[in-house]
């Protein structure tokens, strides 16, 4: 009886597999010092320290796998154990599981909530034991030291059998804290991840909180990606002076490697508190005017396949799309995706 009970208990314990054995989506380069980092290790002593540290956040990355398990469990260790007062810990350093449905859409399953630096959680249980394709989104504002996926000990976990999201010609995004995912409630609600699911296309997130300042080495990393579209959303972080000094150079680094790939510029959002804060309103107007001037200058020089998305309707007019007047809630992320997705869809269908 004790032997039988021991076997039953053992069968109830999940078997864990290192996530490094499964495909990782959302990286611009494989030349990183660790698997879940975003910039090549060669930039460690070249990039500004805050930019480099943010590149160690796993924003926009996702693991793809397949399993017939009745449950999915996770073990993970965060790199920094970050915490912020305007964003959920799930969004910062948690994980987010989706599965592919027969109707041709990715469906949210559940999130894994962190309790600290080292974590263990059962994401979902009591499922029917049938084969499912999964996508696991990684933390937006922290990095990972390790990640393991747990399944029933008698079940299988394998490589994905469908090539979704499509990895050919990914969409490469560059930008700020908002683009990195601030302040989505969970990783799957970052707008780059929403757009990826809607288009079923891999997206690469090169958002760096407070540091989307047109650092030219980032443009060089982007230029090495065989992208379908490049989206440049840096205006909230870049000063007018930085735009005048670096924007065209940043653009040309990418354009020289990709003469016909669409490159999209996006205006600064009309932040909700700009209705009241005159200084903020003036700065947003000034930055957007500068962006438009440089963009129009490029057009006059004969540059083709460049586009500008205006921000008037980006996050709505009701003032309800941010957590602090600046960083998007899930509502803001959805509204951004609603504006951007149809435009990008046209670009990748050309």
Locations of the language-model features?
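Short helix-loop-beta junction
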Residues: 192-205, 296
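Catalytic nucleophile-elbow at a beta strand-turn-alpha helix junction centered on a G-D-S/GDSL motif
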Residues: 168-192
């Amino acid at each position: 009886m004790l032997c039988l009970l021991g076997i039953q208990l053992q069968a109830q314990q999940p078997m864990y597999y290192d996530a490094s054995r499964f495909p990782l989506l959302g990286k611009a380069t494989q030349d990183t010092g660790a698997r879940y980092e975003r910039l090549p290790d060669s930039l460690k002593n070249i990039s500004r320290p805050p930019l480099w540290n943010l590149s160690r956040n796993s924003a926009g990355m996702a693991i793809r796998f397949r399993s017939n398990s009745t449950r999915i469990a996770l073990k993970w260790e965060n790199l920094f154990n970050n915490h912020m007062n305007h964003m959920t810990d799930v969004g910062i350093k948690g994980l987010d599981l989706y599965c592919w449905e027969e109707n041709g859409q990715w469906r949210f399953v559940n999130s894994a909530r962190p309790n600290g630096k080292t974590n263990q959680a059962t994401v979902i249980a009591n499922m029917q034991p049938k084969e499912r394709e999964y996508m696991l989104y990684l933390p937006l504002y922290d990095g990972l030291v390790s990640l393991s996926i747990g399944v029933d000990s008698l079940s299988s976990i394998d490589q994905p059998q469908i090539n979704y999201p499509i990895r050919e010609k990914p969409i490469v995004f560059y930008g700020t804290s908002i683009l990195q995912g601030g302040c989505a409630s969970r990783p799957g609600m970052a707008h780059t991840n929403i757009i990826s699911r809607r288009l079923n296309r891999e997206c690469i997130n090169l958002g760096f909180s407070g540091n989307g300042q047109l650092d030219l080495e980032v443009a060089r990393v982007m230029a090495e990606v065989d992208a379908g579209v490049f989206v440049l959303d840096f205006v909230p972080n870049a000063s007018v002076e930085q735009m005048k000094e670096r924007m065209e150079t940043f653009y040309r680094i990418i354009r020289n490697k990709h003469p016909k790939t669409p490159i999209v510029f996006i205006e600064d959002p009309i932040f909700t508190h700009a209705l009241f804060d005159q200084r903020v309103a003036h700065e947003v107007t000034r930055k957007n005017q500068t962006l438009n001037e440089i963009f129009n200058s490029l057009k006059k020089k004969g540059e083709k396949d460049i586009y500008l998305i205006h921000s008037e309707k980006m996050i709505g007019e009701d003032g309800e799309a941010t957590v602090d007047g600046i960083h998007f809630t899930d509502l803001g992320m959805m509204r951004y995706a609603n504006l951007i997705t149809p435009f990008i869809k046209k670009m990748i269908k050309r």
